[in-house]
From Swiss-Prot:
This is Flagellar assembly factor FliW. Acts as an anti-CsrA protein, binds CsrA and prevents it from repressing translation of its target genes, one of which is flagellin. Binds to flagellin and participates in the assembly of the flagellum. Its main location: cytoplasm. Keywords: Bacterial flagellum biogenesis, Chaperone, Cytoplasm, Translation regulation. The lineage of its organism: Bacteria, Bacillati, Bacillota, Clostridia, Eubacteriales. It is found in: Cytoplasm. NCBIfam families: PRK13285.1-1. The keyword Aminoacyl-tRNA synthetase does not apply. Belongs to the FliW family. It comes from the Bacteria.
Length: 156
């Protein structure tokens, strides 16, 4: 199979690479099939590219790379929807908002994506009673930046 992504160019994939989101993703409910593509080896960032819509590509990340204590409580209903028999089958990602200055990127910690890597089913879980935000900065300012309000100049 093949799709020409607006962001990523031509992508070839097999049907077993497709992750199905039976309920879609809020704001993209009509989109049900996606590809999870690593941005590079050893980095926590991924593309979540629609398998049908070349213009729909989200940037997602492993939340634990930025928020080691991040946790959500997944109920039995969600586990059943994912055809999950063991929690070890699950992968967790958060959708990022990436502005022009990548250092200002934020993560939606309220509504992570949960993917069963065995069944290839996914859903967006909406956490209730959470202290998390939908725009949590993933890069923390350095102590000097916090004290002065001035970011360090980029080298190069």
């Amino acid at each position: 199979m093949k799709i020409v992504s607006t962001l990523l160019g031509e992508l070839e994939f097999e049907e077993e690479d497709i992750i199905m989101f039976p309920a879609g993703i809020p704001a993209f409910e009509q989109e049900k099939s996606f590809l999870l593509i690593a941005m590079g080896e050893g980095v926590p960032f991924y593309y979540l590219q629609s398998a049908l819509n070349p213009e729909l590509c989200l940037v997602v990340a492993n939340p634990f790379a930025f928020f080691p204590r991040y946790s959500i409580e997944i109920g039995q209903e969600e586990l059943q929807r994912l055809d999950c028999s063991q929690r070890e089958e699950l992968l967790l990602y958060v959708i990022l908002t990436v502005p022009q200055d990548f250092r200002e990127s934020t993560a939606n910690l309220v509504a992570p994506l949960i993917i069963n890597q065995e069944s290839k089913k996914g859903l967006q879980f909406i956490a209730t009673n959470s202290d998390y935000t939908t725009r949590h900065p993933i890069f923390q300012p350095t102590q000097a930046e916090e004290q002065t309000g001035i970011a360090a100049a980029e080298e190069g």
